[in-house]
Amino acid sequence: MEAVAEHDFQAGSPDELSFKRGNTLKVLNKDEDPHWYKAELDGNEGFIPSNYIRMTECNWYLGKITRNDAEVLLKKPTVRDGHFLVRQCESSPGEFSISVRFQDSVQHFKVLRDQNGKYYLWAVKFNSLNELVAYHRTASVSRTHTILLSDMNVETKFVQALFDFNPQESGELAFKRGDVITLINKDDPNWWEGQLNNRRGIFPSNYVCPYNSNKSNSNVAPGFNFGN
């Protein structure tokens, strides 16, 4: 993902990254701590304060959602061929995968990086995930089928836990404050159904809030995750 610096920042420790207002940074990880993101600028990596930058819109990035949960979301009846999401790669932390709906199934493509930090799936390389996604809206992500990326509305598909929830009955879904839950059913206004870490169950609707992938939720604790 990309972000634009809104203020100058001078690193205060070796693991932080300095930048100037107006710089465009590659955000490598924003899921471990909502206050400090891991980013790259001019080949250098380090942590940056999230309130010094403005994220470029990317509703397609869902962070630490598992491969299985990605498939649950993308196999819903309202999802069409080409609808996709980008997530952190389970087998290689810090790297990314693209999950795409195609012909009643979901295909997964690992995003590769070369020694210069450029992103690619096949031959064409890009400076950022944003550029890679934009390119594959008109050029297939697959070499065997024509699969063009297109957006789906994910904001209503996920909720984020405001509090810990410990089940009292069988069939309820346990979660921790900050967890992001795949929303399956909310026909009952008080008890919704969701999935987290390959577990499925119901939970109280007043324990969660809508999840926005582009903003850190100030109501939740640092270290929230997508159930990876």
Curated annotation (Swiss-Prot):
GO terms for molecular function: epidermal growth factor receptor binding; phosphotyrosine residue binding. Disruption phenotype: RNAi-mediated knockdown or RNAi-mediated knockdown in body wall muscles causes ectopic membrane extensions from body wall muscles. Expressed in body wall muscles, pharynx, intestine and hypodermis. GO terms for biological process: epidermal growth factor receptor signaling pathway; male genitalia development; muscle organ development; regulation of cell migration; regulation of cell projection organization; regulation of MAPK cascade; regulation of nematode larval development; regulation of vulval development. It is found in: Cell membrane. Pfam families: SH2, SH3_1. GO terms for cellular component: COP9 signalosome; cytoplasm; nucleoplasm; plasma membrane. SMART domains: SH2, SH3. Keywords: Cell membrane, Membrane, Repeat, SH2 domain, SH3 domain. InterPro entries: Grb2-like (IPR043539), SH2 (IPR000980), SH2_dom_sf (IPR036860), SH3-like_dom_sf (IPR036028), SH3_domain (IPR001452). Adapter protein which modulates signaling mediated by several receptor tyrosine kinases such as egl-15 and let-23 probably acting upstream of let-60/ras. Negatively regulates vulva induction probably downstream of let-23. Involved in sex myoblast migration. Negatively regulates fluid homeostasis probably downstream of egl-15. During the formation of neuromuscular junctions at the larval stage, negatively regulates membrane protrusion from body wall muscles probably downstream of egl-15. This is Sex muscle abnormal protein 5. The lineage of its organism: Eukaryota, Metazoa, Ecdysozoa, Nematoda, Chromadorea.
